[in-house]
């Protein structure tokens, strides 16, 4: 249902594609406009759902999601920078609809406009960074570096907004820039870690450059591929769990900044246990993958 709504929205703005996206980049998959619009709508819908799933809900404000920006980053990688800009802008507009209550804090029309532009439209416009390194780097590295750039640029948008629009509301104007830098880092740092890990994992196991989405595997390493995929999934889940255990304690509930006392509240024993279990599981899965591949090679040589 949600995907259908987004398809209708995209079709209603087909004139945008006609004006800005007449020529599809040479390195993009050759698919019909309908397929491209449908894929984009589905990925934006997925990102919207993931944005509602909170890995961490911080006490002073801000949250960390389950990599909600990754679907749009992957669409940008798949179809190029210009399409990524369009998709990011659309996604930002949807995030604005979900965060309309923030406009109630605006002290003027111009402040409200700045919130819309900085915290939503510009912040997610840069999801187009998913396409920036497609020609220069292998897919996992290209998507991961694009994710880093998108997160950093989104962070800068929030910092500028906090130092201007929100100055004098939450903190004194003279301290607004310093506060904005630190406060926005309390949720954007873990969000960046989660986003980059998810982007690297998906970029490693799926090929987004082909017309039809398919597993990304070398011909000589097909045997045991499923075990390696499982190992990567365990690695990503381990990082997600550690991020939640650590960063959920680091924001000061009264000041909104990083709290040194929060480090003492982190259950480091549990963090270590989760990391150890994850590492052992990954090792076992990789060993199984290696054994399967070796046995396959032996059978081929018989």
Model-derived features: positions:
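Membrane-helix interface motif
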Residues: 100-101, 160-170, 242-256
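Interfacial aromatic-anchored transmembrane helix boundaries in multi-pass membrane proteins
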Residues: 50-64, 90-131, 168-170
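Alpha-helical transmembrane segments and their cytosolic interface
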Residues: 10, 15, 21-42, 175-302
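Aromatic-anchored segments of alpha-helical transmembrane domains
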Residues: 44-53, 92-101, 151-159, 237-245
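Helix-capping/transition residues at the boundaries of transmembrane alpha-helices
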Residues: 76-77, 130, 134
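Mid-bilayer segments of alpha-helical transmembrane spans in multi-pass integral membrane proteins
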Residues: 120, 124, 128, 151-164
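Hydrophobic alpha-helical transmembrane segments
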Residues: 37-41, 70, 85-89, 113-117, ...
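Hydrophobic transmembrane alpha-helices
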Residues: 22-86
């Amino acid at each position: 249902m949600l995907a259908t709504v987004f398809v209708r929205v995209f079709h209603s703005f087909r004139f945008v594609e006609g004006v800005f996206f007449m020529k599809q980049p040479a390195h993009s998959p050759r698919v019909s406009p309908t397929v491209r619009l449908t894929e984009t709508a589905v990925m934006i819908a997925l990102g919207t759902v993931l944005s509602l799933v909170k890995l961490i809900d911080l006490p002073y404000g801000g949250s960390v999601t389950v990599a909600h920006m990754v679907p749009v980053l992957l669409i940008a990688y798949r179809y190029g920078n210009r399409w990524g800009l369009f998709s990011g802008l659309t996604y930002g507009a949807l995030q604005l609809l979900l965060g309309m209550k923030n406009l109630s804090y605006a002290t003027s029309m111009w402040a409200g406009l700045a919130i819309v532009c900085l915290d939503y439209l510009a912040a997610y416009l840069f999801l187009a960074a998913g396409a920036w390194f497609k020609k220069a780097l292998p897919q996992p590295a290209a998507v991961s570096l694009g994710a880093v750039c998108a997160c950093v640029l989104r962070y800068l948008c929030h910092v500028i907004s906090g130092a201007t629009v929100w100055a004098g509301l939450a903190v004194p104007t003279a301290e607004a820039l310093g506060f904005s830098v630190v406060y926005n880092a309390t949720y954007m740092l873990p969000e960046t870690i989660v986003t980059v890990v998810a982007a690297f994992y998906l970029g490693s196991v799926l090929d987004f450059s082909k017309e039809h989405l398919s597993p990304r595997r070398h011909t000589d390493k097909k045997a045991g591929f499923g075990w390696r995929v499982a190992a990567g999934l365990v690695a990503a889940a381990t990082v997600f769990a550690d991020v939640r255990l650590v960063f959920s304690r680091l924001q000061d509930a009264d000041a909104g900044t990083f709290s040194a006392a929060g480090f003492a509240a982190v259950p480091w024993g549990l963090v270590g246990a989760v990391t150890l279990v994850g590492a052992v599981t990954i090792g076992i899965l990789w060993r199984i993958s290696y054994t399967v591949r070796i046995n396959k090679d032996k059978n081929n040589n018989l």
